[in-house]
Curated annotation (Swiss-Prot):
Taxonomic placement: Eukaryota, Metazoa, Chordata, Craniata, Vertebrata
Alphabetical list of PANTHER family matching this protein: T CELL RECEPTOR BETA VARIABLE 11-2 (PTHR23268:SF118), T-CELL RECEPTOR BETA CHAIN (PTHR23268)
Identification of the protein by name: T cell receptor beta variable 11-2
SUPFAM superfamilies registered for this protein in UniProt: Immunoglobulin
Function: V region of the variable domain of T cell receptor (TR) beta chain that participates in the antigen recognition. Alpha-beta T cell receptors are antigen specific receptors which are essential to the immune response and are present on the cell surface of T lymphocytes. Recognize peptide-major histocompatibility (MH) (pMH) complexes that are displayed by antigen presenting cells (APC), a prerequisite for efficient T cell adaptive immunity against pathogens.
Keywords linked to the UniProt accession: Adaptive immunity, Cell membrane, Disulfide bond, Immunity, Immunoglobulin domain, Membrane, Receptor, Signal, T cell receptor
Length: 115
C-alpha cells in the first residue's frame, strides 16, 4: 500500500498523466450482410506519422492493405481499389471502407502506427 501511494504521489508531483497508450480502432467487431457497406475508424498513437491497415483472413498472416505517411499514401498495392477505400484525415485519424462487402472480405481488419 505504501509503495503504491508513493508512486502515485511521485507521478502527481512530476505532472505525469496516466493515459491509455495505443491505437484506438472502432468498431471492435462488425457483422454485416453481403453487399452492405462497412467502415472502420482508427486513431493512431499521438505523434506517429505512419499508419497501416492490415487484413487478416482466418488461418493466414496479416496482409498490408495500405500504408500512409502523414497525409500521403506510401503503399496501396494490396488494396482492392474496386471496393476498398482508405483515407487519412489531417495526418491523424484514418478510415477504411468496404463497399459493397463480399463474403471473401470476412477477416480481421487491423490498424497500426509507427514513428
Amino acid at each position: 500500500m505504501g509503495t503504491r501511494l508513493l508512486c502515485w504521489a511521485a507521478l502527481c508531483l512530476l505532472g505525469a498523466e496516466l493515459t491509455e497508450a495505443g491505437v484506438a480502432q472502432s468498431p471492435r467487431y462488425k457483422i454485416i450482410e453481403k453487399r452492405q457497406s462497412v467502415a472502420f475508424w482508427c486513431n493512431p498513437i499521438s505523434g506517429h506519422a505512419t499508419l497501416y491497415w492490415y487484413q487478416q483472413i482466418l488461418g493466414q498472416g496479416p496482409k498490408l492493405l495500405i500504408q500512409f505517411q502523414n497525409n500521403g499514401v506510401v503503399d496501396d498495392s494490396q488494396l482492392p481499389k474496386d471496393r476498398f477505400s482508405a483515407e487519412r484525415l489531417k495526418g491523424v485519424d484514418s478510415t477504411l471502407k468496404i463497399q459493397p462487402a463480399k463474403l471473401e472480405d470476412s477477416a480481421v481488419y487491423l490498424c497500426a502506427s509507427s514513428l
